[in-house]
Amino acid sequence: MKNLSEFDLVKSMVLMESEMMSIKESILEQLIIEGVDDPGILKCIFMAGGPGSGKTYTAKEIFGVGKGDLDSVSATGLKVVNSDTAFESQLKKNGIDPKDLGRIEKEEPELWDKITKEPGGIRDRAKKLTQMQQSFYEAGRLGMIIDGTGDDFTKLKKKKERAEDLGYDTYMVFVNTSLEVALERNKNRGRTLSDELVTSKWKVCQENLGKFHQLFGGNFSIVDNTVYKPVDKAVQKVINTFIRKPIYNKIGLKWIETARLLKKNNFIK
């Protein structure tokens, strides 16, 4: 494992930020142009479930993520927002095997804190990079799949409220599995966590399940993923209907009206 020196960390993070800042204003304008008539425009779907629940597998089954497209784009046109992708990439660039995280948490607590908790650390910067990516999608009100664990109810509630303030209609897909299966899958993941952390997050997610159902109301589906299998057709149909139906959010409807007016009058070229 390469020594995670402060110089290497800073250099890596600067390169990340430089890469994102290279996106010009013209691209943001293009996002808005695409967003007006995008099939998944102003639809925000939250994926929740503990580590090892199989959210990535479920996203592929429901939305076609990674099937003939980039992993950041689904067949439905929705953009995937997942900080784990940037996190794992940066771990590898810094010479850390993601499968070693469980061991590092137990045996190298100082390095673990530096990676996951330190301001400017790999996890912190990966989240900031993902937030920048998400802001570009939001500029064009492009549809999004926000992938997370769901172990922090308050944080997810705030994300939902923010999306709705921007004009998005929101939905949640909660991917559920037994603790035993989650622990077994964790051992075979590309990024392995400690059994204690998986168990802790799984329990909190279970406690939050009812709260999420109440928060999202009818825009909520549970996918039992204890055994890998095709998603239930009824669940697939409900989610497809949500993506395709007209925008309900009044803020979103106003944004579409304004964006089309700007486009018509060549304010956006």
What are the functions of these language-model segments?
Residues M13-G35:
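N-terminal pre-Walker A segment at the start of P-loop NTPase domains
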